[in-house]
Regions:
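Active-site beta-loop-alpha junctions enriched in small/polar residues
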Residues: 1-2, 20-23, 52-54, 86-90
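Histidine/acidic residue-rich metal-binding segments in metalloenzymes
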Residues: 1-16, 29-45, 63-79
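Acidic-and-aromatic substrate-binding clefts and catalytic sites of carbohydrate-active enzymes
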Residues: 22-31, 55-63
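Short glycine/threonine-rich loop-to-helix capping motif typified by GTGT followed
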Residues: 61, 92-98, 169-177
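Mid-to-C-terminal alpha-helical segments outside catalytic/metal-binding sites
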Residues: 124-177
Length: 177
């Protein structure tokens, strides 16, 4: 958490916590505490809420995802939150299909190997099919529906769905069209 505060403080440009969430809602180490979010927001940056059930906590589904958006937007403003998926769509038969492809060389360590042994990510309950599918990219239009249902304006929805990250990218990389 302190590294996030330090990075935002010393940066001359806005920073992004791209694949995160609100620590107040889940307590996962990948999520940012309010002090970190404040440092990022004060610098003009944004926090990207990820689509990983174990990081989101709560119901671990699209509602938990929207809860993180609500928390950050309510506490820090709609300019402070964006989508930071941290995952691609994985079809239900992915593992079966991957077994058909011969392995070449040594396997790399999966990112989960870097987390503490008691990390929620390792708990099988977060691999529930309902949770996974509700956060699948095929359901991303439902993020918009959910934000409409929760009372966000069209302008705020556009910011959250990509406007905020584009704003930061344009400020950080002004010479790129």
């Amino acid at each position: 958490q302190q590294t996030g505060i330090d990075a935002a403080t010393v940066s001359e440009k806005p920073v992004v916590a791209s694949h995160s969430g609100a620590h107040a809602l889940s307590g996962h180490p990948r999520c940012k505490k309010d002090e970190v979010i404040r440092a990022i927001v004060d610098k003009g940056g944004t926090v990207g809420v990820c689509c990983i059930s174990a990081f989101l906590g709560g119901s671990g589904d699209i509602n938990a995802f929207l809860d993180h958006i609500d928390y950050i937007a309510d506490k820090f403003g709609t300019e402070s939150v964006t989508i930071g998926t941290d995952r691609a769509y994985v079809p239900p038969r992915d593992a079966e299909e991957r077994r058909k492809i011969p392995r070449r060389g040594a396997s790399r360590i999966r990112f989960e190997g870097f987390w503490q042994p008691d990390d929620p990510l390792k708990d099988p309950k977060w691999r529930d099919e309902r949770m996974q599918q509700s956060l699948a990219w095929t359901n991303w239009p439902l993020l918009t529906v959910g934000m409409v249902q929760r009372g966000y304006s069209d302008d705020d929805i556009q910011k959250i769905l990509g406007g905020n990250i584009l704003r930061v990218a344009r400020e950080v990389f002004p010479d790129i069209p």
